[in-house]
Swiss-Prot record:
Family: Belongs to the class-I aminoacyl-tRNA synthetase family. TyrS type 1 subfamily.
InterPro entries per the UniProt record, alphabetical: aa-tRNA-synth_I_CS, aa-tRNA-synth_Ic, Rossmann-like_a/b/a_fold, S4_RNA-bd_sf, SYY-like_C, Tyr-tRNA-ligase, Tyr-tRNA-ligase_bac-type, Tyr-tRNA-ligase_bac_1
Main location: cytoplasm
Top EC class of this enzyme: ligase
Domain S4 RNA-binding: 353-419
Binding site residues for ATP: 230
Subcellular location: Cytoplasm
Catalysis: reaction(s): tRNA(Tyr) + L-tyrosine + ATP = L-tyrosyl-tRNA(Tyr) + AMP + diphosphate + H(+)
Protein's name in the database: Tyrosine--tRNA ligase
Length: 420
């Protein structure tokens, strides 16, 4: 079985590592952790490198620990932040912790010999007193050492509260606690976490004379220079209530050709040979974008499940051609209804309305006059068939699965009517 570095380095997933990590991994599997700040009730794609590092750790025989920062979340990590985060209530944090754990279950197994574990650092941070903390942790760090950390230096001009200044000591205590309680010898995180990670290794070394290790992965930007995971609509979330599975799929499908090889290495478990084969296929026929399609299918299936992914793919085919509308199931049309303009009518209303009325109702036409002109130019369709007259009505037998009717204007403008 390959060790963690042997798995991650060829995929360019390692930015930095502490001395001696390779030698330690050569001795056998290791227990490692990643911390997640529970400032929201969902992870987003910007967290996925951390999640994948835990998944690879488990695949390499190690034991992953997910530390949800219920305690540190009440303080706030200054790393990479221009201003202080709002402090969350205990109830908000507990609710977010439960939601994040559920999402992580799609990436790591919580069963078996090296089952993943979830820990909330509030469980040990809430019980430690200030005097005890200063005695057992604070005395091992000089202020000069703490000021030298990039996470602090970047905030000196704008101002940093003592609360955030002390964050690195609290995270260091997390590492020390996990080393003692669970024999955890590795902390992983983004490259902006290097200072916090090394502070933890320093604390273990000074208090116990033991060696523990750190590993960081790169902060990811796209070829266009933008921060990965950000769109015009904001962050791309794993929670389907925040980012629909359809939009999630489209995010990956729209990956720039210059980024797709790297993202396949980062966010899938495909072998390097499989990735090379996809890229070779793409070079032969770039228009089909097989690499982006495989990336989108793989990540969406892992986050939302294979059934939802199949529905999303079928919904995409409806909008971009290549599928039989009559074969589309209710689940597929339900996906579409969440992504394109939609309206609901009763059976009696359907019997009274013409197709022109429906086109106006869903916003595909401003008036019946526009419908007449569009029909003359063969510019409207109903359920994939060119509309011959705006005065026609939709018969119950013409409805698609689930009582849907799909209206189309031109090549790219769609709307759904659902009969209830």
């Amino acid at each position: 079985m390959q060790n963690l570095l042997e798995a991650l380095v060829p995929r360019s997933l390692v930015h930095d590592q502490t001395p001696g990590l390779q030698a330690r991994l050569a001795q056998g599997p290791i227990t490692g952790y990643v911390g997640f700040d529970p400032t929201a009730d969902s992870l987003h794609v910007g967290h996925l490198l951390a999640v994948m590092s835990l998944a690879w750790l488990q695949r390499c025989g190690g034991t992953p620990i997910i530390v949800v920062g219920g305690g540190t979340g009440m303080v706030g990590d200054p790393s990479g932040k221009r201003s202080e985060r709002p402090v969350l209530s205990v109830e908000e944090i507990d609710r977010n912790v439960a939601a994040i754990r559920a999402q992580l279950e799609r990436f790591v197994s919580f069963e078996g010999q090296n089952a993943a574990r979830v820990r909330n650092n509030a469980d040990w941070l809430r019980s430690i007193g200030l005097m005890e903390f200063l005695r057992d942790v604070g005395k091992h760090f000089t202020v000069n050492y703490m000021l030298a950390k990039d996470s602090v230096k970047g905030r000196m001009e704008s101002g940093i509260s003592f609360t955030e200044f002390s964050y690195q000591l609290i995270q260091a205590y997390d590492f020390w606690h996990l080393f003692h309680a669970e024999r955890c010898e590795l902390q992983m995180g983004g490259s902006d976490q290097w200072g916090n990670i090394t502070a933890g290794a320093e604390l273990v070394s000074r208090k116990d004379g033991a060696s523990v290790h750190g590993l960081t992965f790169p902060l990811l930007t796209t070829a266009s220079g933008t921060k990965f995971g950000k769109t015009e609509g904001g962050a791309v979330w794993l929670d389907p209530a925040r980012t629909s599975p359809y939009k999630f799929f489209q995010f990956w499908l729209n990956t720039d050709d210059r980024d797709v090889e790297r993202l396949l290495k980062f966010f899938t478990f495909l072998s390097l040979d499989e990735i090379a084969a996809l890229l070779a296929e793409q070079a032969r026929d770039p228009g089909k974008r097989p690499a982006q399609r495989r990336l989108a299918e793989d990540v969406t299936a892992r986050v939302h499940g294979p059934d939802v992914t199949r529905s999303v793919i079928e919904a995409s085919r409806i909008l971009f051609g290549g599928t039989d509308l009559r074969a589309a199931g209710v689940d597929v049309l339900d996906v579409l209804a969440g992504e394109i303009p939609s309206a609901t009518v009763t059976g009696d209303e359907l019997a009274a309305l013409t197709v022109a009325d429906l086109l106006v109702k869903v916003g595909l036409a401003a008036s019946k006059g526009e419908v007449r002109r569009g029909v003359a130019g063969r510019g409207f369709s109903l359920n994939g068939a060119v509309l011959e007259s705006g005065d026609a009505k939709v018969a119950a037998g013409e409805l698609l699965a689930g009582g849907y009717a799909l209206l189309q204007k031109g090549k790219r403008n769609y709307a759904l009517v659902k009969v209830r």
